């Protein structure tokens, strides 16, 4: 959550240059071992147009990592699409995917699929990357729709890269028989872990370094944190 304007104003009044432990997009994440591994697998997955699962407990930074990584993709190589509305049905997800690709969805699924193929064709050499956040909350119809869309280009390479972001329950859900077809397509799985004891201090120092202040008392408070 980005800091409230009143909090930012108060920090400025005290001479602080920033607020520690906020999630402004311009702030880099602390590169833990699990984040480094996840980033490597994310880059490999999109390059190969494969399916990847990014999981972890609530609050470990999955969405923060996914968002920053998605925005960092080279626009001359990739066309990123992020969908966060986990309440969508299969038809709704297809419609939103089309809209984000610049197409107006049709009432008939067959017509929408034809538009989707046209959109992929218009992208040329750009690789579409679809990221579904909070994927554990998607209805079975939505996940099944995504699985079928992956096969649009068969027997050629997949039509797009798919990144599923979710909590620890997502992997268990995908292992169920109803989702076995999608589960079998997962080429990589990265789990974001919470900070280890050895990572806590450098993480705190990195964040607090943004809280430089002209007020000596505040700097002493930071040093004692």
State where each predicted segment sits.
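Short regulatory helix/loop adjacent to the ATP-binding pocket of P-loop NTPases
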Residues: 70-72, 170-185
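A short, basic N-terminal segment
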Residues: 1-48
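Residues at the beta-strand->loop junction immediately N-terminal to the Walker
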Residues: 55, 84, 132
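Walker A/P-loop nucleotide-binding motif
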Residues: 48-68
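Mid-core helix/loop region of P-loop NTP-binding domains shared across ATPases and GTPases
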Residues: 2-12, 16-20, 88-96, 104-145, ...
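AAA+/P-loop NTPase substrate/partner-engagement loops
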Residues: 75-100
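Walker A/P-loop
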Residues: 63-79
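Conserved AAA+ ATPase "SRH/arginine-finger" region at the nucleotide-binding site
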Residues: 83-86, 174, 187-199
């Amino acid at each position: 959550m980005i800091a409230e304007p009143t909090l930012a104003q108060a920090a400025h009044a005290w001479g602080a240059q920033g607020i520690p432990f906020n999630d402004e997009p311009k702030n880099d994440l602390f590169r833990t071992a699990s984040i480094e591994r996840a980033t490597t697998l994310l880059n490999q997955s999109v390059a190969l147009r494969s399916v990847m699962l990014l999981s972890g407990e609530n609050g470990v930074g999955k969405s923060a990592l996914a968002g920053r990584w998605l925005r960092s993709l080279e626009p001359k190589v990739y066309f990123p699409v992020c969908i966060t509305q986990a309440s969508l049905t299969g038809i709704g997800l297809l419609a939103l995917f089309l809209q984000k690709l610049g197409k107006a969805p049709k009432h008939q699924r067959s017509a929408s699929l034809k538009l989707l193929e046209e959109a992929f064709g218009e992208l040329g050499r750009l690789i579409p990357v679809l990221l579904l956040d909070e994927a554990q909350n998607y209805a079975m119809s939505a996940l099944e729709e995504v699985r079928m869309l992956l096969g649009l280009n068969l027997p050629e390479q997949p039509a797009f890269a798919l990144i599923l972001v979710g909590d620890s329950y997502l992997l268990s859900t995908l292992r169920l028989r109803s989702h076995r077809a999608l589960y079998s397509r997962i080429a990589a799985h990265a789990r974001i872990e919470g900070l280890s004891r050895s990572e806590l201090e450098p993480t705190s120092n990195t964040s607090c370094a943004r809280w430089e202040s002209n007020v000596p008392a505040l700097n002493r408070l930071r040093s004692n944190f």
